[in-house]
Amino acid sequence: MNALRAIDFKRDDPNNVSVSVLDQLLLPYTTKYIPIYTIDDGFTVIKKMQVRGAPAIAIVGALSVLMESQLLLSEGFCKTQYYYNLNDWENIRSKIDERLAFLLSSRPTAINLSNALDEIKIVLDSASDLQTFKNNLFDYVCKLIDDDFANNKRMGDNGAEFLLNLLKKENFNEDFAVFTICNTGSLATSGYGTALGVIRSLWNDSKSKTQEGNPNKKVKLTESSPKMVQVFPLETRPYNQGSRLTAYELVHDDIPATLIPDSSIAYKIMTSKIPIKAAFVGADRIVRNGDTANKIGTLQLAIICKQFGIKFFVVAPRTTIDKVTEEGKDIIVEERNANEFKIVTGSAVDMQTNKPILDEKNEPITAKVGIAPENINVWNPAFDITSFEYIDGIVTEVGVFTKNENGNFDLSALH
């Protein structure tokens, strides 16, 4: 089975790299990659949410700077649509610095992009010329991508092992289910995923436990007997990342899943034949006290889980930690255009076959459909802030952080 890729980065020749990103607005029926040549291209795909997920945003942002630098070193530098004096390195440095600020404005809530651009500024300030900057930036971006993938696998195993050991301590030995919201998998990262990475690790572990006697079976993460046998992804309105993207990944990986409405969480807990033992969510920013900014709807999921005694975990790499901001109330929450709430985009479907209707190019026909009165006022925040008090653990690549005896997180080791 081919691995899902949100970002196609061809880097065999460091002097002639190419970047394209999967247009996630067209999923699940259409697979189309958008080439990235400049910082403007990176800004556009991030702003329009053609690429999303905090780690992927940071990677695409960094890659767009690399691509513009490569373009400046070629005869096609005029395509950047931005004035550089190529005979003056200080001018180039100043202009790139301005461009980094512009790029950051594409999605201000996600700390990963800010952290990556801060690192690029260090690379920029230490370079003596454009070629050196581009070469060092190539090394930085490659490390950013490779570290992200390796860290995702570590996070997945850390979170899965922690939950399974927790269930073992509770003498819980049954099959169980988990919640997740938005999309935190391969489509939101360099691969494997954060919160969805934990779910992948839980599923891989459950399969190893059903293969007794098979000498080629995978090593179990723990000796506990519970198995995750079902995932309940929330649809995640209004952009439907859960129904369009997470469901797409779960089907792709043959992980048993049932898509549920955002408004059905409590009722699903009360009526599920399979006990729901945990929720795993991603993060766009985690501040010093553990308050977490994530996709709108995360807070209500956390509150409901708290009410029903279901463990709630945030899964994110250290690059998502905001080392400066003390509390969630100080996080700037991005508000999106009203039409993104009032208008939905999707593929036309044949009601007899449930298959997409194709055009003359054999591609699914897409359309925008209004679902609200034209003149109704709309409040459309992209994120909400979940207080640390609702979070049972923060899963990172270096381990799982829980609260101390005073009920507080100490994340200083991640700073």
UniProtKB/Swiss-Prot annotation:
Cellular localization per UniProt: Cytoplasm; Nucleus
GO biological process: L-methionine salvage from methylthioadenosine
Active site positions: D284 (proton donor)
Pathway this chain belongs to: Amino-acid biosynthesis; L-methionine biosynthesis via salvage pathway; L-methionine from S-methyl-5-thio-alpha-D-ribose 1-phosphate: step 1/6
Catalytic activity: 5-(methylsulfanyl)-alpha-D-ribose 1-phosphate = 5-(methylsulfanyl)-D-ribulose 1-phosphate
Marked site: Transition state stabilizer: C182
GO MF term (any one): S-methyl-5-thioribose-1-phosphate isomerase activity
Pfam families assigned to the protein according to its UniProt record, in alphabetical order: IF-2B (PF01008)
Entry GO CC: cytoplasm; nucleus
Keyword Isomerase among UniProt keywords: yes
Keyword list, A-Z: Amino-acid biosynthesis, Cytoplasm, Isomerase, Methionine biosynthesis, Nucleus
EC number annotated for this UniProt entry: 5.3.1.23
Function: Catalyzes the interconversion of methylthioribose-1-phosphate (MTR-1-P) into methylthioribulose-1-phosphate (MTRu-1-P).
Family named by the database record: Belongs to the eIF-2B alpha/beta/delta subunits family. MtnA subfamily.
Name of this chain's protein: Methylthioribose-1-phosphate isomerase
